[in-house]
Amino acid sequence: MADDLYQKGIKKIQELTASADDNPTGFMDIGEAFKDIAPDLTQYVVEFAFAGIYSRPGRDNKQKVLTTITALVAQGKPQIGMHIKTGLTVGLTPEEIIGCIMHLIPYTGFPSVLGALTVAKEVFNEQGITVDTSAFQ
């Protein structure tokens, strides 16, 4: 049963990242970084977050990833870059991602939004993506 749950989580990660790789977009680096003190972290991330939460019905992957990006902006968490990459993979446009981040200014404040925009800009630059700023005028 646990192996089935783990495999379900791995399949969901691969679906979200369009990768057959064993470490798509660095998701597994999280567990690897802490295996000396929390050797079961990867299992929790894969089984709970991806086999459980991300696999729940009712919302498509774009909505789920945009919700995750929103939560990470609000918390000012560094994992936002990984999830921006995932958002692009599941079909979010750069403009949708930037629009979401900008919408959070009155709710999370300028510092968290500026931090998120910095990360988004880095991700877009790495991937050679240009944002259509006319969408915001």
Whereabouts are the PLM-identified features?
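Short, hydrophobic/aromatic alpha-helical segments in well-folded domains
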Residues: 83, 100-103
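Short, structured motif recognition centered on aromatic/hydrophobic residues
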Residues: 63-72, 100-101
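Acidic, glycine/proline-rich low-complexity segments that act as flexible tails and inter-domain linkers
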Residues: 1-61, 115-137
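Extended intrinsically disordered, low-complexity coil regions enriched in Ser, Thr, Gly, Ala
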Residues: 78-96, 113-123
